[in-house]
Amino acid sequence: MERLIFTAPLAGLISLTFAAFFAKSILKEDAGNKRMKEIAEAIKEGSTAYMKRQYRTIAVVSVIISLLILFLLDEGLKIAAGFLAGAISSAAAGYIGMSISVRANVRTASAASGGAGKALKIAFRGGAVTGLAVIGLALLGTSSLYILYGDADLVVGFGFGASLISLFARAGGGIFTKAADVGADLVGKIEAGIPEDDPRNPAVIADNVGDNVGDCAGMGADLFETYVVTSLAAMLLGSLIIGTYKNAVLYPLMLGSAAIFASIISVFFVKVEKEGKVMSALYRGVGGSTVLSLIAFYYITGFLMGDSRFFYVTVAGVVITVLMVIVTEYYTSKSCRPVKTIAVSSETGAATNIISGLSAGFESTLVPAVVIAAGILVSYFIVGGSADPGTGLYGIAIASVAMLSTAGMIVALDSYGPITDNAGGIAQMANLPAQVRKVTDELDSVGNTTKAVTKGYAIGSTALGALALFADYRNKVSLESQSISLDSPVVLSGILLGAVLPFLFSAVMMSAVGKAAFEVVNEVRRQFREIPGIMEGTAKPEYGRCVDIVTKAALHDMAMPGFLAVIIPLLTGFFLGPEALAGLLTGLIVVGFMLALMMDNGGGAWDNAKKLIEDGYYGGKGSEAHRAAVVGDTVGDPFKDTAGPALNSLIKVVNMVAILFSPLIIGGGFL
């Protein structure tokens, strides 16, 4: 039984091997004509340059924090080493995602000349490289450190490193991509009246670069972090019930191993048998991964735990995933009521479009909240939480681990989106035939849905995983502190501080996008005004200027969100005590979850309302409704691609800070 744990790092290595195999097969595909290669090279150079500058900045911060951990904490050397390993692994996950995306995009565009089948294969397998790399690195790192240290508490540093880099990646990438996107749309579509991805737009390359550094690299680092901290939370809680269930720490690692093999097999399920069935092909892959994982979970549970109730908990986790996907698709799909309502409201102007979009976003929080609440209760009580609260909390953690059984496929779906988006942009800028653009538009339309759906999944898994992390924090501090009571003014003060943190964080992120977009808009206007021949297509815009503007803005403004995530919980714990920090975590998890849902779903609904009008409905392109929808989309962009997704990372970073520094916080506070 002891040797079984080596299955986990082995599974991680196998996942990385298949990621390399798929990457190699993609690179063998044709990259198109000279013009396509030039455009793709510009996107690749911009993406690579930004990532390198971002990682240099993050490296300095990581070294400083690792030194603080080294000198402040017991076993500081091991925890600091784990922190650096987590930071490097998270950065690697993001870089791999970006690297394959900027190579798969042009090959997808080239393959589109032969129809959707081959183009889908290249785009999805490009996404699968990121997905398999993310879960492979996460499981390899977590299990290897546990084997090396023999204590789950010492692996917390790895989770903190992953969380912090994810926050920087989400914040920086989100600011970059949406500043470029908003700037390109406001001047290009509204003022100049030129279509999306038009080579005459000076911000078009920055916009395409942003798809890679924001969506691919950002989501890769985000779900890497989620995978690590959720597995770690289950292991930490499992160590508390090891007297009853001797394999409670090993169990989540084995579930993760089985899910990797299910994901690898399911990649081969994704193929288009008939034209127009792209979404069905993608969901077939996710469904295959889910079914194979559950079959494996059944046998693993019987072998390791000897208690079928834990299998039912994994089923509950998978059901939560399915329901979150369904709800998110409903609120962001062009064929459903919320998006159609926003599109109709656009006919009377931007104001009614904004009002309808906000309404849809607020409404979209109801069902997910009920789903997560039901999942928590079912997972807790089904394993006997009423009799043994420790086992009940472990059940919640296992449900969140089960949610991540589809993480490899979910990351693949998310990364598929920017690959097809870039492919469409390359086809447009290279003036490829209309038939090619039709194929890339079809793939991109599906990609917009998958990006929205995966955000809903990420939020749900964050909420459930954060509860498990909170339970571990509470266990650590309650050993030497009074019980945490909601009628305590100290706890209530902490709840208020935690509740306001997501709003403060979002304000910082939205402000950063607004300032950077302002500079991009002015630069694009300057080029249209001062460079003759751009609109006629006889002069080439200075693409590098816009890339440089958003790069500087992203690197400058990503520091403050990270600072807030680390310093506020530490100050709360040190000055108000561990009970106040517990309240802060409670307020943060609840409000952060709701606000992230509202922003992601509302932003996705605004985006697809615009695309619905561009499909020819409610006036079509160039109409007043279209202009209003573009305004709504530019408001929704930083909602769904900057502030909303970054809230996931904020929630996990703050929880990891609380757990990691809990030995210093115990006994602290002036109240």
From Swiss-Prot:
Catalyzed reactions per annotation: diphosphate + H2O + H(+)(in) = 2 phosphate + 2 H(+)(out)
The EC number(s) this enzyme carries: 7.1.3.1
Record has Disulfide bond as a keyword: no
Pfam families tied to this protein: H_PPase (PF03030)
UniProt-annotated location(s): Cell membrane
Any one GO cellular component localisation term in the record: plasma membrane
Membrane protein topology class: Multi-pass membrane protein
GO molecular function: diphosphate hydrolysis-driven proton transmembrane transporter activity; inorganic diphosphate phosphatase activity; magnesium ion binding
Biological function: Proton pump that utilizes the energy of pyrophosphate hydrolysis as the driving force for proton movement across the membrane. Generates a proton motive force.
Family affiliation: Belongs to the H(+)-translocating pyrophosphatase (TC 3.A.10) family. K(+)-insensitive subfamily.
Protein name: K(+)-insensitive pyrophosphate-energized proton pump
Lineage, opening ranks: Archaea, Methanobacteriati, Methanobacteriota, Stenosarchaea group, Methanomicrobia
